[in-house]
Amino acid sequence: MDDLDAVVFQEKLGTTLAKSKRIVKLAGHLCESMGIDGQEKEDILRAAHLCKADLVTGAVVEFTSVQGVMGSYYAKAAGETDAVSQAIADHYRPRFSGDNPPATRVGKVVAVADKLDTICGLFAVDQAPTGSSDPFALRRSALGIVTMLCAGDDFEFDLVPAIDAVLAAYAADGIEFDAQAVREQVIEFFVTRTKVMERDNGVSADAIDAVLAAGVREPLEFAKRVIALEHARREDPDTFNDLAVAYGRANNLRDPELGVDYDDSLLCEVEHALTCAIVQAEGRVARALEANDYPEALAELASLRKPVDLFFERIMVMDEDAVLRENRLKVLNRFVNVFSSVADFGLLAK
């Protein structure tokens, strides 16, 4: 392994030995994030430690296309477990569009750690993709990470904290860069890759834009929200219609500049019923979002259709009395804010 200290990873980012140490560190972070322990964690950390060792062997120096594959053979011959040798072979995957991801969770963790280290490092030294130029295939690497993350199996973690962990490791290695700026660039890079993946999967552009407008940055959360919206539109039209109508009626009149602090003493019975429904929905939607149960969050929002319809049937929002008018608009502002925590429903076509 010490020979890797003579192998340059990238001119401004140091050696492959330093990269290997960061991969191990991030792999440990990912294990903690996903609750991986025991033998599986040991295999992950061992594979992370050894995954670049074959770069100094004659076979890989001569034929770079066999990197990882040769490392797997060497690891097996040295008595490493099957899980470790398989992960070493797989950690470059997916190598190209349509390629399969690593076959095991051990391999996926090492693959993500390697790819994320490369992406963050190159962004830190101003080597991000530009236009059609992507010499380090960072878009493919990011899409590989997002695809693994959103595959719906036992491989789920928050990406933003992992990005933070990588950037902290680079800073600890003495690499100088604007941490906050690079952080935002990398996060936005992954958001864009997630958008591309979902569009390729047939998700409507308006659903993607609606979720983005809610400030969602985590690829897994983003994917689950847009899928829930698309499912409601295609498979549960009644719920989707309730969402659209309830939001639309309130949004047409709301005045954000007034805020949401309405005066309870000015509410009549119908207004009070709506505000009670809003307060209940706020709590239920927040709990559903915390549990990543986005269909439930949409169902809770759709349940507001009845009380808001009754509100508009019985109440003249634009009352001549300015105090009553502004108070009712504040109620509608708060109503719309509940929806905005999930998506910007104003961007959704019916």
Regions found by a protein language model. Name each.
Residues 1-350:
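Amphipathic alpha-helical "coupling" segments that flank catalytic cores
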